[in-house]
Amino acid sequence: MKYLVYDSTFEGFLTAVFAVFEYRYNEVTIVARHRFAPLLFGEEETVYTDANKAQRVLTKIEQCWGKEGVAIVLRAFLSEETHMEDYLLEAIRLMVKYPEGKVLENFAHRAIASIRKAAKSVEREVHRMKEFVRFEKIGELYFAKIVPEYDVLPLVVPHFKTRFSDQQWVLYDPERGYGFIYNLHEVLPFTPADKHFGALTPATADAYQTLWKTYFQHINIAERKNAKYQMRNMPKRYWQYLPEV
């Protein structure tokens, strides 16, 4: 068995799918780096994310399944369900084999059923987050801490950017250790150095304003490229496929 280990990004996963077809792998499984355990048996291969290869896979999916199909794949991926990468690979293999077939409608197939169930769950979680997330206003800053069941933070950010376009805000997921900052100009992903960030609400507005000035406003270009939070950042070009964003 060959194990394709990727960087946990959606583009990394699509690159791994590309590799499966490029090298005609049969006995293969795709696994995120943070979930991969050293093997006694089997062959490990690191997949290096390639945006061009990822786009080719995405284009093929859209050609066969349309934007709705891409949305289903995206949502299922963000579910973080165990073995979801392999379910998606299985579905894509069926798509290539039966390009005119309604593969995603075959709910009797275990992989398809798992994908559709996960995608639906993620979609519901996105709507739930939009409805129930509440920002706390501290000084000039709005702050919200959320722990969604699925990794939906990138999918709800556009909603809050539109809703609070005239306010500075922070949306943070302490369970996954990353968040997004809106500074009135752009939305930026961030990963705090302190693993306990957001665990306690500062007692005063002044304390939080100090945090804003000393931490958030000094994020530089190098930090924006930090691989840890890029793992969680859904590129904006994928938002077009998701009605909820």
Each predicted region: which residue ranges?
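Glycine- and acidic
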Residues: 1-3, 142, 194-197
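A recognition module on extended beta-rich or small alphabeta surfaces enriched in W/G with H and D/E
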Residues: 165-237
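N-terminal ordered "arm"
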Residues: 1-51
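Intrinsically disordered or highly flexible coil/loop and linker segments, enriched in small
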Residues: 27, 67-70, 124, 128, ...
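Internal, well-folded beta-alpha domain core
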Residues: 101-192
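Charged, alpha-helical interface segments at or near domain boundaries
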Residues: 31-127
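Short, hydrophobic/amphipathic alpha-helical patches that form generic packing surfaces
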Residues: 12-23, 89-94, 155-162, 209-217
